[in-house]
């Protein structure tokens, strides 16, 4: 972990992260994780810096060893209604409230915290500085990637399994040629343009 993080004085600390702010399609997915100090997990890092194979292996280890973990999400309709930032905050709240053990402190990746029932702190680059946030980033990323692979089976022509819904040249080309699916975020510029909403 880079730039040593000084932990707050707390017994049960949850880490929270989100995946999927940038894609044009699908939910924004969040995870909250309380790690077990007696069952350390080696190799936790920002999910974006790990190979897919390593992420999958760590996913299994985290879900098995964590004291508690939970996923949250906000669907495309909620993203369009609220905007992506507020939808991500809502999904984080859902992840924290889904924990079966109530944390006494929550550390969140980024520079902004959602409203929670307990003290919280936003940690810039938290996914590479805080083990709990790294674990949350891995759970959220693996979950969302799996959803994109499933969506790819329904809409193979869009290539969701490859680009995970991000606005790559290929995705934009297919969006222009084929139009938007019901899973596309209508409030996002490229989708708006295709639907003639701009």
Curated annotation (Swiss-Prot):
Top EC group: hydrolase
Lineage summary: Bacteria, Pseudomonadati, Pseudomonadota, Gammaproteobacteria, Enterobacterales
Cofactor: Mn(2+); Mg(2+)
SUPFAM superfamilies for the chain: Ribonuclease H-like
Annotated keywords: Cytoplasm, Endonuclease, Hydrolase, Manganese, Metal-binding, Nuclease
Positions annotated to bind a divalent metal cation: 17-18, 109
Underlying gene: rnhB
Protein name: Ribonuclease HII
Function noted in UniProt: Endonuclease that specifically degrades the RNA of RNA-DNA hybrids.
Keyword Signal recorded: no
Co-factor note (free text): Manganese or magnesium. Binds 1 divalent metal ion per monomer in the absence of substrate. May bind a second metal ion after substrate binding.
GO molecular function: manganese ion binding; RNA binding; RNA-DNA hybrid ribonuclease activity
Natural source organism: Yersinia pseudotuberculosis serotype O:3 (strain YPIII)
